[in-house]
């Protein structure tokens, strides 16, 4: 029976790299995969997943109105899909998470999601909360703080390098805007503004 997986971490842990490698492993064996990413995440171009180390792939996009189950079911009816991959899973809606669960349960296709657990304020993303609750398997991807401890938190910085403590939960940005910290250094950074 297929499973729904949630691979989570903070920024710059290699989530997209791992997704692209796993998808390649299927494709190398002649199996078809589908990769999805958020439509508004255009850091690598719309409909593209890219890693910091230079790997990239085209991807289908999702937005609030996308029915992931219907889309995957239709594509699977045309040609078998061996695995579904979702990058930036923290940008899914809660109903998307249940659609992904249905892909695993009803279509018997493994679904591998990759995303952030918490935002810059230390709060769970709604989709991450749902994935933590219902995913069959949870996998933490580790990265490190500047002190060498495991990084579990992320801080957002403005264009002047000052820590941001308020604002929209979702704001697309990369290496210069977000920095990963252990909890101790996140608290010190977050409280210093």
UniProtKB/Swiss-Prot annotation:
The record's top EC class is: transferase
**What is this protein's record name?**
Thymidine kinase
Record Pfam families: TK
Tell me which family the UniProt entry assigns to this protein. Belongs to the thymidine kinase family.
Q: Name one GO molecular function term.
A: thymidine kinase activity
Q: Quaternary arrangement and interactors, per the entry?
A: Homotetramer.
Q: Where in the cell is it found?
A: Cytoplasm
Query: Single Gene Ontology BP term?
Result: DNA biosynthetic process
Q: Name one GO cellular component term.
A: cytosol
